[in-house]
Amino acid sequence: MFDIGFSELLLVLVIGLVVLGPERLPVAVRTVAGWIRTLRSLAATVQNELAQELKIQELQDSLKKAEEAGLQNLTPELKASMDELKEAAEALKRSYHSDIGLEAPHTIHNPLVTEPEAIHDGVTPAESATKAQASPQAPATDVDKTVTPTAVETASNNNEKPIVQVETFSASISSVDREPVPVTNTPVTKVQTATVDTHSTDSHGADQPRTHQPGGDR
């Protein structure tokens, strides 16, 4: 490995014996021998890896050459079948594109929505226009008025004054667009006139005994 002859090795041993002495020389020889072994093992592993990589590269090259040769030497039957498959695939593509071209003119695309209110409600301008035409126009004003009835209760056969009950109802006015308007019912006021029984007071005064006080000396 290092191209060292016997004379050179003997010279190295003599120098080591003089420098290290007889006690350290065997230890030095062992360490040097261990280093030589490790270096030889590393060199062997590197050579083996390089050889394997070269073999793998050669195999790959040979496989590529074999595939190219096999494709060139195909039988005419295989070539015909491959051509038929290609033609069928192209026919399917042409039919698909023709169907798409026929369906394209019949499709109706919605126009772009530019109004923010229509975008928020999710209604296109065309739909809003049709809804506006279809909806009938409401009358300008619809006023529903209710009559305020007055109830008059007459008293019985006795001489009582009539009791009058007045109930008022509010009028409901509907808006122009027929939107629901909240109707506030005003509280019902009942006016009752106090009854004065004059007849009973007169009769009560008549029933009381009249006391005659004697006057003074006449």
Curated annotation (Swiss-Prot):
Membrane topology qualifier: Single-pass membrane protein
Keyword Transport: yes
Subcellular location: Cell inner membrane
Residues forming coiled coils: none
InterPro entries: TatA/B/E, TatB
Biased composition (Basic and acidic residues): 199-218
Pfam families from the UniProt entry: TatA_B_E
TM regions (residue ranges): 1-21
Subunit structure, interactors included: The Tat system comprises two distinct complexes: a TatABC complex, containing multiple copies of TatA, TatB and TatC subunits, and a separate TatA complex, containing only TatA subunits. Substrates initially bind to the TatABC complex, which probably triggers association of the separate TatA complex to form the active translocon.
Recorded family membership: Belongs to the TatB family.
PANTHER family in UniProt: SEC-INDEPENDENT PROTEIN TRANSLOCASE PROTEIN TATA, CHLOROPLASTIC (PTHR33162:SF1)
Protein name as it appears in the record: Sec-independent protein translocase protein TatB
Organism: Yersinia enterocolitica serotype O:8 / biotype 1B (strain NCTC 13174 / 8081)
